[in-house]
């Protein structure tokens, strides 16, 4: 996609103005877990009611969400424009788009949709996979290969001011240390519009070192998606839980707040349930957790919310 010098300059200006790391700036009026900072996630293919664009946007507005991260499947592609129009009608900001893993025709189509609807600064969430590397040479080659792949997406996204967010989804790519190596290599190439979106539901094996990982990710962190977290939940049928029902939820929220990071907070459905019902449940759980953040009792002594 060739946007020309003028469009590219405009996109670069948008990137500078609303770049991915601006949210780390101090702001005395900022409230990390306020409704205005929340993002609805995993509610398009994950929705028992199979809402269309208008129903979905109306539901988000009714629940008080002002931001949305768009995930999709092949059947949703014909409705891309309708989705953008519905979001605009209901005053919902498109924060992020679940993006193809390489720069293919579908990726070009998405950037064209963003351009057509004058949407700048939309995060592109890109996942990866891969087994563990076996030695230093293997690691170096893997980092270079993944950096090449991400660069193919990041450079065409820059004219629209869109940052690419590396999305942890398990495997080698889902380890923050590896993502940070990819980002460092890209920065050495002059590619600076790449950050991280961290998903708790894909981080069960990382919770014990979460504060350490959070500190390292913080300069590059674009968003955090919350989830009800219990030890080993991914191995015991509790991969996805409503907020407040996980034993680790309060401790993790305290870690996030204590880090000083500022940025969007995602609430997800990611189940076959009605998206509205699960979002309501997460909103309720988050509200009750926030009320306990300053409770002097250790998180381990505060009982999780009962399940439905």
Which residues does each predicted region cover?
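Bacterial N-terminal signal peptides
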Residues: 4-19
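Hydrophobic faces of well-ordered beta-strands that scaffold small-molecule active sites
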Residues: 37-43, 68-70, 94-97, 120-126, ...
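Active-site-adjacent beta->alpha loops and helix N-cap segments on the catalytic face
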Residues: 76-83, 175
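Histidine-acidic metal/acid-base catalytic patches
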Residues: 26-39, 51-58, 148-155, 176-308
């Amino acid at each position: 996609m060739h946007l020309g010098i003028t469009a590219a300059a405009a996109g670069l200006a948008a990137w500078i103005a609303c770049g991915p790391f601006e949210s780390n700036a101090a702001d005395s009026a900022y409230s990390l877990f306020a409704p205005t900072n929340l993002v609805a996630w995993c509610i398009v293919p994950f929705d028992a009611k199979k809402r269309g664009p208008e129903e979905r946007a109306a539901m988000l507005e009714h629940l008080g969400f002002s931001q949305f991260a768009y995930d999709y499947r092949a059947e949703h592609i014909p409705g891309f424009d309708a989705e953008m129009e519905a979001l605009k009608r209901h005053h919902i900001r498109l924060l992020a788009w679940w993006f193809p893993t390489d720069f293919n025709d579908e990726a070009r189509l998405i950037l064209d949709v963003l351009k057509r609807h004058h949407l700048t600064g939309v995060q592109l969430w890109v996942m990866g996979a891969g087994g563990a590397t076996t030695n230093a040479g293997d690691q170096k080659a893997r980092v270079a290969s993944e950096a090449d792949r991400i660069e193919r997406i990041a450079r065409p996204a820059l004219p629209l001011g869109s940052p690419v967010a590396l999305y942890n989804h398990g495997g080698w790519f889902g380890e923050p240390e590896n993502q940070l190596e990819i980002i460092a290599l890209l920065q050495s190439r002059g590619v600076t519009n790449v950050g991280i979106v961290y998903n708790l539901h894909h981080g069960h094996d990382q919770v014990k070192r979460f504060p350490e990982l959070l500190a390292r990710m913080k300069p590059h962190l674009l968003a955090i998606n919350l989830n009800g977290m219990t030890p080993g939940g991914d191995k015991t049928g509790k991969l996805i839980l409503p907020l407040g029902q996980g034993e680790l939820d309060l401790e993790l929220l305290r870690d996030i707040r204590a880090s000083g990071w500022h940025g969007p907070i995602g609430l997800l459905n990611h189940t076959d349930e009605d998206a509205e019902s699960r979002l309501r449940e997460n909103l309720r759980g988050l509200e009750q957790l926030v009320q306990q953040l300053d409770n002097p009792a250790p998180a381990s002594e505060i009982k999780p919310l009962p399940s439905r």
